[in-house]
């Protein structure tokens, strides 16, 4: 016959610690994702040309046991950022959805900007007589995709470390 004895107080303490671990894993995940998105945002801002604005962070709904973070461009206040990332006209990156852009030049009305100093040809509409500069477009200067790829491994490590720290906190009693 096998006889088993246990200390009810220690068993209850163990159950409480396990509950604390479950809570801390979610908390650690959230902290890790928050830090990872902040680090990705910081790198994207370093890679982006121009002002250090227009790149936002959002932590998505955590009530579904799925924690998600995203770094994205503020297209409402900075609508040109997609063109900076993917380019325009014949230089457009196909990943940006610009498959037609390889065949279509851009037309800029002469009243919008004086581009004569750049030597762009001028097209006169046979229908309206209006004049347009014919421009090829702008080369892409990606910043979001490189930041995401460069931060991929580091983000995994940031999240892993945050979860490990929360678990260590929950099981401190065990290591003492």
Roles of regions detected by a PLM:
Residues 89:
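Short, His- and charge-rich active-site/binding loops that engage polyanionic ligands
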Residues 1-78, 92-176:
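Short, Lys/Arg-rich flexible segments
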Residues 78-85:
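Mid-chain, well-packed structural core segment of small domains
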């Amino acid at each position: 016959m096998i006889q088993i004895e246990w200390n009810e107080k220690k068993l209850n303490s163990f159950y409480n610690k396990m509950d604390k671990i479950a809570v801390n894993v979610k908390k650690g995940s959230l902290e890790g994702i928050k830090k990872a998105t902040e680090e990705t945002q910081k790198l994207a801002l370093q890679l982006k040309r121009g002002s250090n604005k227009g790149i936002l962070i959002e932590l998505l709904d955590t009530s579904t046991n799925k924690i998600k973070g995203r770094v994205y461009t503020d297209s409402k206040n900075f609508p040109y950022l997609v063109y900076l990332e993917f380019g325009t006209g014949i230089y457009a990156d196909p990943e940006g959805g610009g498959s037609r852009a390889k065949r279509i030049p851009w037309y800029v009305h002469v009243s919008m900007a004086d581009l004569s100093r750049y030597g762009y040809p001028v097209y006169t509409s046979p229908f309206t007589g209006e004049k347009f500069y014919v421009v090829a477009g702008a080369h892409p200067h990606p910043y979001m995709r490189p930041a995401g790829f460069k931060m991929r491994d580091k983000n995994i490590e940031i999240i892993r470390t945050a979860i490990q720290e929360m678990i260590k906190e929950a099981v401190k009693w065990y290591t003492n």
